[in-house]
Amino acid sequence: MKVNFTETVLRDANQSLIATRMPYEDFEAILPELDKAGYYSLECWGGATFDSCLRYLNEDPWERLRKIRKACPNTKLQMLLRGQNLLGYKHYPDDVVRLFVRKSVENGIDIIRIFDALNDLRNIETAVDETIKCGAHASGTICYTTSPIHNIESYIKLAKDLESMGVQSVCIKDMAGIMDPQTAYDLVRGIKENISLPVIVHTHSTTGLGPVTLQKAVEAGADVIDTAISCFSNGTSQPPTETM
């Protein structure tokens, strides 16, 4: 079985370890090497990158995306989108969501990972629909947590609902790094048995379990795992790409 890698160094690793403060010129020189590495995708935009470019780095986030696209012609570029919240901190109207998605794709994004923090799929419907209409890959997301009502069965139902919505892949997003290895195995296996889409697993090394959690996810059939190049890995970031 082939396992693919999404490299997070330009987005989530950058965001998790240094609050998304890495300016474009700090990573410009390495972009051609990242492009040749053979990643499934390069997560490079969305999340807090948009806000940080404007608020702290004095950069145009759209221009950053265009530069990355030009430097990485052979690798799919990926972004993280907060559903109806886009890259902001409030809900936006449907027409704004559709225009933002359209412009993201036009400026170079290939894959949009779309989530709602409370797994309310009504808040991602518009973004998913527009992503598909634009010819990009809509990756529907399940935000992982633990509680009396959050269990394997509830997440399998969410995965089925995402498949019915038309997404092209399902991502299990363990943003707090609290998913243990056995749960990762059971969850990935359960979802793979109930849907026909690729399953992606995203975690953090916050608790130190990240590498083993991803290993068990792969054993259960995960198609893609998120990792970060070693110098930007571990801690609150992703497990190291080289180790995995």
Language model segments and positions:
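N-terminal amphipathic alpha-helix/helix-capping segment at the start of soluble metabolic enzymes
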Residues: M1-I18, L65, K70
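Catalytic alpha/beta core domains of metabolic enzymes, predominantly
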Residues: M175-M244
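Short catalytic helix/loop segments, enriched in acidic residues and glycine
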Residues: P23-L34
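Hydrophobic faces of well-ordered beta-strands that scaffold small-molecule active sites
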Residues: F5-L10, Y40-C44, T75-G83, D110-R113, ...
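Alpha-helical segments flanking ligand/cofactor-binding loops in enzyme cores
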Residues: P32, R102, D129, K160, ...
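Glycine-enriched alpha-helix->loop->beta-strand junction motifs that scaffold or abut catalytic
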Residues: G38, G108-D110, C134-A136, S164-Q168, ...
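Active-site beta->alpha loop and helix N-cap motifs at the rims of alpha/beta catalytic domains
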Residues: G46-E163, V167-V170, D180-P181
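An N-cap/entry alpha-helix motif that binds or orients negatively charged groups
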Residues: L17, A29, Y40, F50-Y56
